[in-house]
Structure formats: C-alpha cells, structure tokens
Regions:
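Periplasmic-binding protein-like
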Residues: 282, 286-327, 374-375, 479-484
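Structural transition elements
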Residues: 315-352, 367-374
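Extracytoplasmic/peripheral linker and loop segments enriched in polar/acidic and small residues
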Residues: 37, 391-401, 428-499, 528-529
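Long beta-strand-rich cores associated with HINT superfamily self-processing modules
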Residues: 495-529
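Ligand-site clamp/hinge motif
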Residues: 181, 211-257, 389
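N-terminal lobe/hinge region of extracytoplasmic solute-binding protein
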Residues: 32-82, 111, 188-189
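Surface-exposed binding/hinge segments that line
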Residues: 79, 122-171
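Gly/Pro-rich hinge or "lid" segments in bacterial periplasmic/extracellular proteins
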Residues: 64-65, 157-216, 223, 342-343, ...
Length: 529
C-alpha cells in the first residue's frame, strides 16, 4: 500500500502570504485569452477554459511548486491498493455557496465528467466505480492499471453537487442535463475566485473569495476581468497605456519584443508542451516514411528558434530532442538536439517511392495564431530545396477542428501548440498517436502503428516510474523513426505583463508548476500599491 500525506501541502501554502481576513482593496487584474471561455469545468479543454477551472474550482491533488510532483489539495491524503485509490478529504473546505465539501461532491463530479464525455474526460475512461465510503472518504476503482490516474485528477474539478442539483435543466434521466445550462453561466466551486458575470465570447468577471481554505496572497486582486478575443495591436496599446495587465500567450514575437523593450515584464511557463508540425500519414506523398523523414531532416530547426527569440534570455521555444519536452519523463537528453541535415534529407528522398514534383503540399496555419504563418513560410522554403511545391492555406480554428476529423479532409501539414494537460507524458501522447483515438486536432497525423500503440498501452499500465521512463524513451525513439511529426521546438509559453503586479510562479523557476496554466492562478498574484 502507498500512502501520500498532507505534509506536501506546506510547499504550496508557502507560496501564499496567507490571508484569512478580507484584504484592503487590491484593485482589478485585467487579462485576456482567445475565445471561447468555457465555464463548465467538465468541458474545459483549451487555455481559457483551464484558466477558469484552476481559479474557480479546486481538485483533489495539485502540482507542487518547483517540482513535477503532486500534493494533496482538497484531499489531505490518499492510499493506493492495486487498482483502488482511496482519498481522505480535508474537513475545513466549503464551497462558495457555503455548502461543505463531502465525498458525495467528488462522486457527483466524476460521474458528471464521465456522463458528459467532454473536455478531458478521456483521462477517466478506466474509472469503473466512484463511491463515498463516508462523508470524508471517497474511493475510485479502476477497470485496469492506469499509472497516470492521480495526475489526471488535477483536471477533475470538484463541483458543489447540492447547488448543481438545485439547478438542473431539461434532460433525460435522474440528473436531467447534469446542470450544463447552469454551469455554463454560473460557478459552483470552492476556488479562490467566484464568477460574477460570464459571456464566453466577451468577458468573465470574477471576485476574490476571502473564505478560500488556503488563503490568498495578501494583495491578491479583488476583481479579475478576463476578456476574450482582443487583437494583438489592441493588447499592445492597452498594456503600454497601463490599461491591461496580462496578455494571452498568442501575441506575435514582435509585439512581445516591443512590449518588453517598453518595460513590460515577460511571464513564462515551460517544460510541459511543444510546437509540432504534423504530417497526414495517410495522404501521399506523406504515406511514405522516407518522404516524412526527408522533410523532417530538411526543416531548419535553428531558424525556427531564432524566429521566436524575444530577448537575449527569453524565447517562445527551446531546442527539441524529440516528441517529449526535455525534462519530462521519457524525454531524450538535451545534447540530442534536432538539427537540419540536408544530406540526410536527400538520402531519404531518394528512397521514397514518390517524386516531389508530382505533389503540392497543403501547409495549413491557424488564422487566430499569426506566428504559424511564418512557420508555414519556413516550411515552404525548406521543402522547396527538395523539389516540393506547396500551398499555404489559412484555416480558422473552428474549420480546422472539423477538417481533421477525417483523414481525407486533413491537410498535408497541420500546426499545433500543445501541452501535457496533467504534466504526464500519457496526457500528451496518447491522444495524439494511439490508433484507437478518433481523429481530432491533436492527431492530424492519423498514425496507425502497432508498436506505438503497444508502448502507449504499456506506459499506462506500468506503475514503476523508472520503467515508465524507459517505455516513453523507447516510444520517443520509435516516433523519431516513423517521423509522423516535425518536432519544431519545446515550447516556452510567454505572456506580456504590466508592472502593476508580481506573480512568482511565472517569474521564479523555483516556484513554477509542472502543469500548464496553473501558475496563472490569481491567488498567487500580488497587486502593487
């Protein structure tokens, strides 16, 4: 039996200048992201949704600062016996409604996540049964060994089941709509911030919850205005004029450079994601592995890194060694940095059964992410050196997500910035490369490879961290050989910020978190006088 205690909570609590009393007016924090802002935590999948989840709701476990480990959060401890995970809940937690947290809330939250089958519900496919042992104890029984289960719980928001049940909408069965209509516009969490108003296309307004069980930073903002869909030029002007505080992560490099030069601070997160150039392995000429290898070798990785450099010390990316960011379980060592090799590219092309002059490659880029157009241009220039013609196509995100559902509609090349939602390699790789997963924006490669499937399944079943690392290293090597993807760079997410606040998890590596977006938890913000 393994037992994980609450002592690790001290690390997290230590990041906060605890305040159980209402603080003096600490002002308004203004932030933006790409729409839409999905408020229902069971449907959260994108950046804006996740940011709302981490601020409005809490989870059983949470990442530890300066570490890749996990600590109890709403739980005070847990034990593991085979496929059975038992969590003891903290006694002092209350939802924003005033209702106490109980095991029934955890059961409801898991069953709701599974019933809606949306967001990151794929993380809980192996959960066979969730039961309240007593008011403060909840037990999960899995149908099969699943090593990333506890990491997945960082994305299971615990909702106030009593409040939701009082607000069920139309639908079939006992739980009707499971409160979807209500939770799309209201919060039912225990988090440090409560929703005041919500328009998923325009703005979410949140107010601090001074009854939060862990306390907030002494000068945490009283109000957060979270806006959606601001243009880069607008954000630049607003920050420069002192009218905005934190940008989205999608500002073009030159805007970030300009803001930094004008005195804005740059906030960073790294270690959990990457930028991928994904090849449709079902569409000629990319159905030939040697063609894919040729294009991978022809890509100018160093030019890509130069394109995203912001200052002498900050860039949007770091050199990649493979599919997993350097430092993640199973990643390859930094000295194996991927580099352009035109001699190897020509050798691979000579072994390809297709002739480059017979094809025009469709190089897509997402309309809402201007940086991707530059990488499309870089690919076009690189691939032309091998004799490939190409067409650059701008695709709105909504249309792109529709197209990639079917291999025949998927472009030759798709671009994706993504992160491991839980910090675990399974969360990054399974949805991208396992052949059992339907085509989504994560998997426009449409790869089918028995060895890849086998390694992904082994990684899920193996509980020993060292052996899991070996499995994911082998998977990394296999994917480098198959070349379904050009691993452009390991991602470093950069936000521009005003100088009106400090946010240690985004500026001090010793206080950073191993889960994307968690560092933007508003309770860690200290507004300046």
């Amino acid at each position: 039996m393994k037992r994980i205690g609450a002592a690790a909570c001290a690390l997290l609590a230590g990041m906060i200048v605890a305040s159980t009393k209402p603080a003096s007016a600490a002002g308004v924090l203004r932030i933006d992201e790409v729409p839409v802002g999905e408020l229902d935590p069971s449907k959260a999948s994108d950046v804006a949704d996740t940011l709302l989840l981490f601020n409005v709701y809490d989870t059983l476990v949470a990442p530890q600062p300066g570490s890749t480990g996990l600590a109890p959060h709403l739980a005070e401890s847990w034990t593991v016996e085979g496929n059975v995970y038992t969590f003891k809940l903290r006694s002092e937690v209350r939802f924003q409604s005033g209702n106490p947290l109980t095991a029934d809330d955890v059961v409801f939250s898991m069953e709701r996540m599974q019933a809606l089958d949306a967001g990151v519900s794929y993380l809980f496919k192996t959960v066979e049964k969730t039961e309240a042992v007593d008011p403060s104890t909840v037990r999960f029984t899995l149908s099969a060994p699943y090593a990333p289960f506890v990491a997945g719980l960082t994305r299971l928001a615990i909702v106030d089941s009593e409040l939701v049940k009082e607000n069920l909408g139309d639908g079939d069965g006992e739980m009707k709509d499971w409160g979807q209509a209500y939770l799309s516009a209201h919060s039912a969490g225990s988090g440090a911030y409560a929703v005041v108003s919500h328009n998923p296309q325009e703005e979410t307004v949140m107010a601090r919850n001074d009854g939060y069980f862990l306390g907030l930073a002494a000068a945490a903002p009283d109000t957060v205005r979270f806006r959606y869909g601001l243009e880069a030029a607008t954000v630049r002007t607003l920050i420069a004029n002192g009218e905005h505080d934190i940008s989205s992560q999608w500002l073009p490099p030159e805007v970030l450079k300009s803001l930094a030069a004008e005195g804005a601070q740059l906030l960073t997160e790294s270690g959990t994601g990457a930028f991928y150039l994904k090849m449709n392995t079902t569409k000629p000429p990319l159905d030939d592995v040697n063609c894919r290898r040729a294009l991978s070798a022809a890509f100018d990785y160093e030019a890509g890194i130069r394109m995203v450099a912001l200052t002498d010390t900050v860039a949007l990316g770091k050199p990649a060694t493979g599919v997993l960011p350097v430092g993640m379980l199973g990643s390859l060592p930094a000295e194996r940095t991927l580099r352009r090799d035109m001699d190897a590219a020509r050798k691979y092309l000579a072994e390809c059964r297709h002739k480059p002059e017979d094809f025009s490659l469709e190089l897509s880029w997402i309309a809402e992410v201007p940086l991707e157009e530059r990488f499309a241009l870089l690919m076009q220039a690189n691939f032309a050196e091998l004799g490939f013609k190409s067409e650059i196509v701008k695709v709105p995100w909504a249309l792109f997500t529709e197209r990639v559902g079917k291999p025949e509609n998927t472009p030759h090349f798709s671009q994706l910035f993504t992160d491991a939602a839980t910090g675990d390699p399974d969360a990054l790789l399974y949805q991208m490369y396992h052949s059992s997963v339907p085509g989504t924006f994560y998997s426009p490669e449409h790869l089918e490879d028995a060895e890849v499937d086998q390694l992904l399944d082994k990684g899920r079943a193996e509980s020993d961290p060292a052996r899991r690392g070996e499995i994911y290293t082998a998977l990394n090597e296999r994917l480098l050989s198959l070349a379904p993807t050009i691993f452009a760079y390991d991602r470093q997410t950069v936000f521009a910020g005003s100088t009106r606040f400090t946010l240690p998890p985004m500026t001090d590596p010793a206080k950073s978190f191993g889960i994307p977006t968690y560092g933007l938890s508003f309770r860690f913000v200290e507004m300046k006088p």
